[in-house]
């Protein structure tokens, strides 16, 4: 079940059965999955599967969270809600995070600090406002022609 998926993660991180069940119920409620708690995880829609993955990760009470293209495959209409979920993970759980995602608008909205790479090389590091105005980043993501026309 969806609940068992989250409980197993908490148990694997050392929580006792009671704490694992409490943690699962809390996370499912906070991530909007409580109505599916007893449903098979395989029956979830894609966006709900993504939220379940976040719940499983948070059940382990990590200090660091790596999100590698967490909204990949979601319909565009669901991306803002998922961005809000990522923000709440950052703000409420206090975990340091690393977010890998090609949608620069989403990255700029969610992240406090960016490390931009192009072909494995660092282009720039800094706050979103600094990165937004960086010509090397613009050239890499928009193409040199687009930068020259601006």
Tell me the role of every PLM-derived stretch.
Residues 40-44:
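Conserved ABC ATPase signature
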């Amino acid at each position: 079940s969806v609940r068992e998926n989250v409980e197993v993660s908490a148990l694997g991180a050392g929580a006792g059965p009671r704490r694992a069940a409490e943690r699962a119920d809390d996370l499912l409620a906070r991530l909007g999955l409580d109505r599916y708690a007893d449903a098979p995880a395989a029956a979830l829609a894609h966006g709900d599967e993504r939220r379940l993955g976040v719940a499983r990760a948070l059940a382990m009470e990590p200090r660091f969270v790596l999100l590698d293209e967490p909204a990949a495959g979601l319909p565009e209409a669901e991306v803002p809600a998922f961005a809000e979920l990522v923000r709440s993970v950052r703000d409420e759980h206090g975990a340091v995070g690393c977010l890998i995602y090609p949608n620069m608008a989403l990255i700029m909205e969610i992240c406090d600090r960016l490390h931009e790479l192009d072909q494995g090389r660092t282009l720039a590091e800094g706050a979103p406002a600094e990165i937004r105005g960086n010509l090397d980043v613009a050239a890499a993501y928009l193409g040199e022609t687009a930068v020259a026309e601006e």
